[in-house]
Amino acid sequence: MAIALAEADKYEVLEKIGCGSFGIIRKVKRKSDGFILCRKEINYIKMSTKEREQLTAEFNILSSLRHPNIVAYYHREHLKASQDLYLYMEYCGGGDLSMVIKNLKRTNKYAEEDFVWRILSQLVTALYRCHYGTDPAEVGSNLLGPAPKPSGLKGKQAQMTILHRDLKPENIFLGSDNTVKLGDFGLSKLMHSHDFASTYVGTPFYMSPEICAAEKYTLRSDIWAVGCIMYELCQREPPFNARTHIQLVQKIREGKFAPLPDFYSSELKNVIASCLRVNPDHRPDTATLINTPVIRLMRREVELNNLSRAARKREEATMQKAKDVEQAFAKLEKEKQQIRSELENSIRREWEVKARLEIDRQVQNELDKLRKRFECEVQDRVAQEVEKQRRNANYREDASLRSSGHSSQMSSSNSEDSDFPSSTDISQLSLESPTNKAAKLPKKESRTPFTRSKTVVDSPMDIQMAEPSPISIASLSLSPRRTSATYSGKNIFAEGERKRPKFEPTLAYSDDEDDTPELPSPTRPKVKPDPFKAPSRPLLRQNTTALMQKLSTQPPIFPANPSRLPQMSAPDVRESKSRSPHRRLSKIPSSANLAADAGSPTRKNGVKSSPSKMNGGDEMFKAVMQRNMGGRTLVELAQARAGGRPIDEVKRCASDSRSGCSVPMKSADRDPPAVWDPERDEMPSPFLARGRKVIRNLR
């Protein structure tokens, strides 16, 4: 039971086709490969012994028959629990012949003669296999030649024949391409060739006259049934029909039937008429019918169709195999490429690892070398720096001892030589002098009110255009009579220079100042200074520079004879202040320094010059007054360039250096250089021009 249920689970029921004499017929699908089958379900509980014998005979007949025009039998299943028997047979998708006849009758049409001959030839071929136990010989190319004789049965089946005994349109099935399939061998009987069936079976419309006369059933009884089926296919009704069974038997024994329509050929009419003869000896047998010329021609056509179908199947199978081979080849190629890529990747990764290890090793070696070199270099630098610091420390100790011993001598020599502190020139320097390496940080400029930080350079768009020409013709000085300086105020560069403020305060005023600085107007447009032009210097107050007429009446700042200056008993406070060697030196001394170095807070009258010199001075004074000149005289400028010393002393030192009488002195024995302190002294500049705006109280 479990085995039967397991077998039943292998199939899927699709639909119910119909009912047979012993059970139900269903359309099923095999789950393993999707093959469509026809299952005949038979319940043998209520069967009699005779019916069970017929069922067993059908099993034996179906298992022994294998023909293209006979329904194929595959296997069976026996369900003992429910006493059911399943027969799995070939499925015919075209229906049966009775459905074709009904469709023709419903549409009021007649079957074509070609279709009738094709059905007749295949049906006769199937009966030939049942009656003679072998397949008929192939027609081949000899269509019009003599027909071969039937060979008959051989071996143990030589005296066995199969009678269908139930031929009717319902038992003739059609395939998808109108292939005839003879089936339903439930009433068939396996008998000896010399025996005759005496049992009355079959459908009354297709009974032969000998069956009606209670005579023996022979092979020619199936030929009578074939004639009745072909007549009904052409005429759309049976040849013998009556309301009662007795009338039907009388008509069959008489053998009279209505003629076929005239559009059918005489050959078809003669074949059907020969099959419907009352005397069975006058009827043709299966071998005679199969050798009819038209049937042979139809068989040849069927053979060609089968050959073409087989060739098409083989071609499809070949194409499928070729496709499978191509797919397998493509798969192999893909696997080959994959294996190759994997191999290349593995080799590349291996070599990359080796290369990386080698690179790391070489890099590590180089790093070790660099570390060793760095350590050696650091040690050398440290040793050099230690030696240098040691030498500097020794030098500073020696310099401090020397400076303390000669401090008094330095002060006396400074007072006797000149009124100004001596400045250091290149002849007074030595290799032992300390160097000033301290870098001074630039002072950060603070922002003023109503101003913005300058982040970009001025462009020409910041200057107002006065005229299209960038330069005036008047500035070219084409006239030889022009004596004044050329000035053009209409080109863009002069206009920009004129509109630019000459001086901007860098520091905002504070509350402790007396005067309020002039702040820029917030409404006046500002023009940023042009980085490509030299900035103009502002003027200081007028009272910071002495007038020429005042300077001309006073004696010169530097006396001609420094020995006449009175010696101060107490040292000056400003002189005692140590001058830092790192402070910026200035060769132009101020009036305060001159007065302090002279030893008197007042200026003394100098020696009167000769009349010739006085006359020259008056003339120079007049020229100065006419030209409105201010500042220091040329003599004072020359003395300033000489470092604050008198010109006579400078000339004397120069002559002594040329004569070789001077003895080189060390830096410790020389006078300290002159220093100008911007925080204490006032330094008027002689290079200022008049007519500019004066900035007051700017510190």
Curated annotation (Swiss-Prot):
Active site (UniProt): D166 (proton acceptor)
EC main group: transferase
GO cellular component: cytoplasm; mitotic spindle pole body; nucleus
Alphabetical GO biological process terms: cell division; chromosome segregation; G2/M transition of mitotic cell cycle; positive regulation of mitotic nuclear division
Name of this chain's protein: G2-specific protein kinase nimA
Alphabetic keyword roster: ATP-binding, Cell cycle, Cell division, Kinase, Mitosis, Nucleotide-binding, Nucleus, Phosphoprotein, Serine/threonine-protein kinase, Transferase
Function text: Protein kinase that plays an important role in mitotic regulation. Seems to be phosphorylated and thereby activated by CDC2/cyclin B during mitotic activation. It is also required for spindle formation and for nuclear envelope breakdown.
Location of the protein in the cell: Nucleus
Family: Belongs to the protein kinase superfamily. CAMK Ser/Thr protein kinase family.
Reaction(s) this enzyme catalyzes, per UniProt: L-seryl-[protein] + ATP = O-phospho-L-seryl-[protein] + ADP + H(+); L-threonyl-[protein] + ATP = O-phospho-L-threonyl-[protein] + ADP + H(+)
PTM characteristics: Recessive mutations of NIMA cause a specific cell cycle block in G2 at restrictive temperature due to lack of phosphorylation that normally activates the G2-kinase.
Positions with a binding annotation for ATP: I17, G18, C19, G20, S21, F22, G23, I24, I25, K40
Modified positions (Phosphothreonine) in chain numbering: T199
Pfam families, A to Z: Pkinase
Listed transmembrane segments: none
UniProt organism field: Emericella nidulans (strain FGSC A4 / ATCC 38163 / CBS 112.46 / NRRL 194 / M139)
Classification via Gene3D superfamilies: Phosphorylase Kinase, domain 1, Transferase(Phosphotransferase) domain 1
Domain Protein kinase, first and last residues per copy: 11-295
Ranges of compositional bias, category Polar residues: 425-436
Signal peptide: none
Basic and acidic residues bias: start-end ranges: 386-400, 667-683
InterPro entries: Kinase-like_dom_sf, NEK_Ser/Thr_kinase, Prot_kinase_dom, Ser/Thr_kinase_AS
Chain residue ranges for the region called Disordered: 386-463, 490-538, 553-617, 651-685
